[in-house]
Amino acid sequence: MKLLAVRRLFRIQRVVIRYRLDDLLFALPLPWWMLAVRFVLPWRWLPRRKSELSRGVRFRLALQDLGPIFIKFGQLLSTRRDLLPEDIADELMLLQDRVPPFDQQVAIKLIEEQLGARICDVFSRFDETPLASASVAQVHAACLKTGEEVVVKVVRPGLKPIIGQDLAWLFILARMAERVSADARLLHPVQVVMDYEKTIYDELDLLREAANSSQLRRNFEGSDLLYVPQVYWDWCRPKVLVMERIYGLQVTDMAGLADQRTDMKMLAERGVEIFFTQIFRDSFFHADMHPGNIFVSTVNPWAPKYIAIDCGIVGSLTPEDQDYLARNLFAFFKRDYRRVAQLHIDSGWVPAETKLNEFEAAIRTVCEPIFEKPLKDISFGQVLMRLFQTARRFNMEVQPQLVLLQKTLLNIEGLGRQLYPELDLWSTAQPYLERWMRERVSPKTLLGNLQSQVEQLPHIAGMTRDLLERMSRPHASDPPRPWHDRKDEPVLRLIGAALLVGGAIQGWVMSEAATQLLTLTAWPAAIMLIAGLYLIVRR
């Protein structure tokens, strides 16, 4: 392991020198003692030609030379536009996670070890030449004995030691950055590397990816918008995933889409609808929707349907995050910057002590220029990015789910405008958001929320009883006293009145519902009424 670490260090140093990344480092506002280090680096004593490549290109090429783990880290960084200069973020978007396949016999041996069976006993056909190969896994086509066409995804062998060593160096660099630079501390580099560590190890667990795929497939069962391939759970293991093979056109295959006369406007709009459906209906979204993971069905090109693969990275939002996000978007497009600032504070995304007026002014300064463009040219992803950048200046905590959301939105938006340049994202999204907001306060939703709260009443009653017993239990050193003081009387009567009113309202709501619902849920209302009456009339 130590030999691997030393070899890796020399490799990193060689790449740093080759692409002159030290120039990028020393251009930052560093302490004097850190700047003095440049005079003791031997390679800086020699004459150096000025590089013709931009800093973004040099950074991207360096990550490519350092291998797949650094490539994937660069891809993660490309989604953090709130942390990086735009020129570097744009270059990192070009990173391609493509590496040569590993030996096919090694792949077969690994699959057989995971399945506990020979390839010929599980598959009637297995293509030894892989369909695709990436840094974490490669994919082979096959056919099950039962006749289904499938793909078999297998994790590369020996990845964990390499990942562990590369992550160790990334953590060292991140901690150094936090120690020497106040600006770097604001960007939380150690937290960024920790997020990447979780992401990369999650991708090594193909059972997690299988579960994500099954969830997404269930969410869109019977949908005209999106199809997710079936997972064959009998043959899934931590390092092997077997799922239905799909046939479709790559979403970036413009010539193929044109040949089959695909309705490009509908295709672009359906992509936006899929995004908002995942966010606001399901609160579960595919967070790696780059063009390599998206296909278009060749069936019914006049009503095109997407096909999504590779659900290794997913995100989810809490109901509170959903609500604040929707309200933020509405407030932003109404140019109600005070409301946007207040929502950020109310949600806990920025500290409660943030000065509202200053935060509002900062948001206005950044966002007003955006509205000089026609509405159809305004980028949702850029809106979120600008809001996050501004909020970071006010110590906004990193919200991993919002980072994934921004990344997904940028992918969907960029893809939609590539398919149909006239796509008006706000006009497409606004009806969906308005419908979602209405449904949030509909009687059906409110009744459902009430039912879920009613189900908690037995637990609440038990907790209340335990609390009252603890309150009434005297300490050993205290003289015996009644379970409540006379000064508690008004509070207890107020609690009783609240229980009485709550029970009456709940009983009325239940009486408006179906009869079978009434019989199941009437007793909690009765308990509330009895407890309320007792607290009011008792002496």
Curated annotation (Swiss-Prot):
What does the UniProt entry say about where the protein is found?
Cell inner membrane
| EC number(s) per entry | 2.7.-.-
The Protein kinase domain covers which part of the protein? 125-492
Has the keyword Hydrolase been applied to this entry?
Answer: no
A GO MF term: ATP binding
Membrane topology for this entry? Multi-pass membrane protein
Q: Name one GO biological process term.
A: regulation of ubiquinone biosynthetic process
Which enzyme type, at the first EC level?
transferase
Question: Where on the tree of life does the source sit, at the highest rank?
Answer: Bacteria
Pathway involvement of the protein, from the record: Cofactor biosynthesis; ubiquinone biosynthesis [regulation]
Q: Which residues catalyse the reaction?
A: 288
Indicate the transmembrane segments per the record. Answer: 23-43, 494-514, 517-537
Q: What does the UniProt keyword field contain? A: ATP-binding, Cell inner membrane, Cell membrane, Kinase, Membrane, Nucleotide-binding, Transferase, Transmembrane, Transmembrane helix, Ubiquinone biosynthesis
Broad class of where this protein is predominantly found: membrane
Pfam (any one): ABC1
- Name any GO cellular component annotation: plasma membrane
Matching entries from InterPro entries are given as: ABC1_dom (IPR004147), Kinase-like_dom_sf (IPR011009), UbiB (IPR010232), UbiB_bact (IPR045308), UbiB_kinase (IPR050154)
Chain residues that bind ATP: 131-139, 153
**Role of this protein:** Is probably a protein kinase regulator of UbiI activity which is involved in aerobic coenzyme Q (ubiquinone) biosynthesis.
Family listed: Belongs to the ABC1 family. UbiB subfamily.
Instruction: List the PANTHER family hit by this protein, alphabetically.
Output: CHAPERONE-ACTIVITY OF BC1 COMPLEX CABC1 -RELATED, PROTEIN ACTIVITY OF BC1 COMPLEX KINASE 7, CHLOROPLASTIC
Cross-referenced HAMAP family: UbiB
Q: What's the protein name?
A: Probable protein kinase UbiB
Natural source organism:
Pseudomonas syringae pv. tomato (strain ATCC BAA-871 / DC3000)
Q: Specify the taxonomic lineage.
A: Bacteria, Pseudomonadati, Pseudomonadota, Gammaproteobacteria, Pseudomonadales
